[in-house]
Amino acid sequence: MKFQNKLNNEDYLNKYYRLNKIYKNDKVLKPFLKEISIISHDYTNELKLNNNKIHIISNTNDKYIYSTIVSINSILRNSNNNKTTIVYHILCPEDIRRRNINKLKSFLFIYPTNLEMIFYNMGNLFNRFKNNRFSQVAFYRLLSPIFIPVERVIYLDSDVLAFEDLETMYHLNFNNNYVLGFLDPLSYGVDYLGLKSEKYVNSGVLLINLDLIRKDKKYYEILYMLNNYKKFENNDQTIINYIFYPNIGILPSKYGIFNFNDIFDIKYIYLKSIRQNLNLTEIIEAFNHPALMHFIFCNPKVWFSNSLFIKKCTRIGTLGKASCIKYHYIWIENAKNTSFFKEIAKYYKIK
């Protein structure tokens, strides 16, 4: 098997540079485009060129490299190797360690027939903004329409695990929406932004309509909000919901369901916060049979050491703690399916 470092991949790079050419003379966008560059476009010579492609964005840095590895591995293990090629767009800060990029590239040898990886150096893209409360990495995908030359893309946080193939999700109808997301019952921004709770989505799992965002030039509004507003409780999530409202669609609940305690927990949280267009039956079915599960409800995060996790889990009551511990071990089992479990166990002090 021969490894290809395809900075000369004409098909993708031609599209990339054509898109870059459109925006390079734009006074607002030019400073951002100057920061972004492709590190490499990689695949093996065994890649099936005629497969359908699913484009996925992942933000990462040195701190979250292992959670990113586990998330990506779960996607690839559950993809349909015979029909689908996963094209991963990995958005990295300028200071990410080369050895961590190489760890991600090792997936090319494990899944040689159905994986491409494109690594982007995002430079110091968001240093210019006044709001430094949140990690810059979280904001990278907000500008993906100006440098990723495809029609649509899935975005996944690193605390998301897959249990099914994502081809059906990827080809969902946008119905003229900018994004499709998982209906978030913890809708922090609804009240003070005047949004409707039945349209407020979590930003950890998204299907993004890059073509429509480019057509309507919504990136200008994104940049304006980043530069002028400081009071977002949920940073990039609030921006996405505010800028794209009301053209926000709801994903089937199986794509992005949270790691709730149980069915009673689901009913309590959703009925308390969302009054319209609520399909509890679908949400409960998704909880029992998820395609993508977002591990949002564990504090500390599910990947921390067994003893720390059990001791410091902030879930209330015996049921809450037991639930969190259950999800902790689900994540560990997924980590064991990677080539880096020894490193992961050492890093997070997992026994």
Q: For the regions a protein language model found, what residue spans apply to each?
A:
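A glycosyltransferase accessory/donor-loop signature
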Residues: 3-60, 210, 215-351
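Short aromatic/hydrophobic "clamp" motif used to bind/position activated sugar donors
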Residues: 153
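Short internal beta-strands
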Residues: 86-94, 181-182
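The conserved acidic donor/metal-binding loop of glycosyltransferases
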Residues: 157-161
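Histidine-anchored nucleotide/phosphate-binding helix
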Residues: 65-81
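Conserved donor-nucleotide/metal-binding helix-loop-beta segment in metal-dependent transferases, i.e.
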Residues: 162-192
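Active-site-proximal specificity loops/subdomain of glycosyltransferases
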Residues: 108-146
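Hydrophobic targeting segments
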Residues: 53-58, 75, 87-90
